[in-house]
Amino acid sequence: MVGVGFAQRPGAVAEVKGEIFGNIIDSIGGEAIPYATVMALNPLDDKMVAGAVTKENGSFSLANLPLGTYKLKISTIGYTTKFVENVVLSETSLTYNLKDFRIYQKTLDIVEIDGKAPEITYEIDKKVVNVEDQINTDGMSAVEILRNVPSVSVGADGSITLRGSAGFTLLIDGIPTIMDASDALASIPASNIKNIEIITNPSAKFDAEGTSGVINIITKKSKLEGISCLVNLSAGRFNNYSGDVALNFKKNNFIFDISGQMSNRSRPSETTTERTTTYDSLVNRLVSVGDNDWSRSSRGFGGGIQWNPNNSHVFQLNTDIKWNQMLPYSDFRFSEYVDDSLVSEFSNFQNNNIDMFNNTSSLYYQYNIKRNINHNVSFKAIYNNSDVVQNDTTLSYNQDGGIRAGNLYTETGPSGSWRFNVDYKLPLKKDRKFEAGLQAQFGSSGDIGKNYTYNSVTETFDFNPLFSSDVEYVRDIHAGYTMFSGKYKSLGYQLGLRAEYTFQTISTTAATEYLTIDQLDWFPSAHFSYSLKNKSQLLVSYSRRIERPRSYFFEPFITWDDPYNVRTGNPNLLAEYINAFEVSFMKPFKSKGFASVEVYARQSNNIINRISSVYEPGILITQPYNIGVAQSIGLEGSLSYDIKKYWKINAGANAFYFILNGNLNGVDYGRESFNYSARLTNTFTFKGYMLQFVSAYESGSVTAQGESLGSFSQDISLKKSFMKNKLAVTLMGRNILGTERSGSTSFTENVFIETLSKPFAPQIMLSVALKFNNYQKVADRNEQMDDF
């Protein structure tokens, strides 16, 4: 509020009037403060003479004021009330400009909010999942968080799919990462995540990349003045541990952030594989049993600065540096049978060492035209750099310990990209908005692959030039988009069109010819929302998307997984094109929760599948191919409900019918399956404790050459908070019943393979989280609760 007061009674010069105007902004970020109350008070008795409420851009005007001296009072929920004394309107100064007046968020007399934010909020083009109120996240990574997110499935091996597809785009605070999505998510501490945006049908403003959409990780940011700190430590079974710290300093119009983290993630499994090969009447059976793991360690730090000199300008500079090491290994014992008679036994050991350095830096500038935060132009520059050193060693041993065969593969190479964006927003009348933008992206990478074969005579590895090659990749993507959105009564709409130009070349020293891609594609999008009674919503959307193959899909190298399996890339892969439709309905139950139902359909053309074929007698080679068209038609539902004050449930289910129409080299790969998954979370609160049970089941699915198995898991968490929720201790158990598994069956010509992998269980983790200042929700004791 703003108020004005007089040293003398106004009205001495009745025919002359004055005006007090200006704009109110946040003291930290410089954002406009809408709906703040501005009062002009008489300083003699503090009675109100005039009042106004700030607009969306924070501006206000108190016009037709009698000349005199006023006292201004500015107040709004969540901010400290401010007064401005001796504001004078006179014949020589008829106006008073309160330009960029800063008010401060409250830091004193704060109490913790008892209520929790909704688990999921629905916007016209996305679902926003609240993460910071989940109790089973301490000490975990973003991968574990996604296990409890609707539409997302995480396999026992850590693989991530969005509505059954592994093709999605990962953003971190809106910035794409050059790392593989699973690797990037494994390096993000769950305690640093505020929200996760699930965008299954992205608008034209987003990159068109991603079969099933976009997952955007929104990290926590402090909101009050001074220094804030968040510290997390955790340790558990199977050599799992982590630690991270985040510091935030805010003063006036500057914000500084710095963070550091280290972690080691390991989830060993026991795997059994049975491979049956039929030669006329002869049956050869190869059985392998052993342990395997894909452990990851991560070290990194990041920092950022934001400067808001006034309500017109915003500057941000951020950088994030990580060192990741992946150490996948397998140790299997093989038994070979011919017509059920044991003919040989040996062991196979594979040890990989992948060292990766990654740096992501970004610069952002936004100019608010006429100090209107809804009318702006922004510029963003992003630099991504990654350097990888990989060593894969495969050794096969006889029973006496002697090496019977071996292979060594090394790969080195940097990759990098530059990305530049310019975006413009223009508010129009009647709740309408126009947006447009341009993007330029330049990407390149190089791989030097060398293959070595074990020499039993010299007991060294000999270089094999036949399976070695240098590869250079160049992929540039330039884009432009335009969007128009608005609202008419209860109907909201958003229409967009995006154009993307792709230029891609691949060169190699191997005798391989690659396609050059030089083409322009169009990607329309349409989103509609309709507000019904009782705050229910109906959402309808459509988008066209593209899934470009990753660079390693083109690799000409031959990589040995074991003595009987090799893999390589395909130089002639084409991009997948996807059409996606959705209809969603969301109904809230007042303060009890909500329910939602979504119907969706997706068609992917040029679908990419990995196909196995005979490489040499007894050896299979796996390559990616475009084999045809895939269709999915599904139904997804979510329910969140407070059964009792101390008991809350969160349930979700997804079911879809999958049809694959594929053909390659005259072989029919057509398959169909009905897939489904379900998740149930029960949360109990009692005497300062929170107890949570998470049960999940995912059915199997078909592939071009087989099918995967279903899996059930059960997690449990117990959390206790101390020191007014500044200190929290969480004990969590994952897969406590030991029922989680991953497995598959596949068939290739005369070869049938069954694989079953079960992770070691249970996985136990103890975590401690310590918060200073305001890494929590706060509200004033004397005002309405407000999650700001």
Regions found by a protein language model. Give the residues of each.
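Outer membrane beta-barrel strand-and-loop segments of large Gram-negative receptors
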Residues: 289, 417-421, 462-469, 570, ...
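Short acidic/polar hinge/loop motifs at secondary-structure boundaries
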Residues: 63, 142, 148, 175-200
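Short, acidic, small-residue-rich periplasmic hinge/interaction motif at the N-terminus
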Residues: 9-12, 25, 29, 37-41, ...
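Surface-exposed extracellular loop regions of Gram-negative outer-membrane beta-barrel proteins
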Residues: 213, 217-231, 298-303, 324, 387, 503-505, 534-580, 601-622, ...
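N-terminal periplasmic accessory domains that precede
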Residues: 100, 142-145, 160, 183-184, ...
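Outer-membrane beta-barrel translocator/receptor signature
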Residues: 208-215, 223-274, 296-299
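Short, acidic Ser/Thr/Gly-rich low-complexity loop/linker segments typical of extracellular
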Residues: 43-59
